[in-house]
Amino acid sequence: MLRFFIIFSVLLIGLFTLEILQPAEKYVILPFTSMVADISVWIVQGFDENVIATGNVIRDKVSGFGVRIERGCNGLEAVIILFSAIFAFPAPFKNKVIGFVAGFFAIQLLNLVRIISLYYLGQWNYTAFEWFHLYLWQALIILDALVVWLIWLRTLPGSRAHPDNLEPETA
């Protein structure tokens, strides 16, 4: 347990430090965040043609309302937490890679739901938008990383999560 905590802490601190460096901002964070905005708009345009993306901003062409996807709103912090937890845990490397890739997409999928819901919530009620943005959705994205990690733990070899590994109860 101590080994896990130390490796988890080192990975977490190291990755969050890398994330705030200027080259990471310029070459990873900003392009990724713009891509998240573009994907969000692509999804929304399936049922609302009045939405556009400009960089990291999603805007309604009619009302002018927009949301800016900033650092901390692109899901990468939750991905860093998940990566640190998965790669700190003693498990086969193949399982770590599979768990991380699946977890990355699970977090980003929920983040797209978050961004789109906040886009429409902000047009409806700005106070509700602020509350959901600052409190509910931030907690849910981090909780998503935790849930993905817990599910991943149950899929590891030797885990008792598989029904065929369970021994029958004795009477």
How does the language model describe each region?
Residues 1-171:
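Hydrophobic N-terminal alpha-helices or hydrophobic patches in metabolic proteins across all domains
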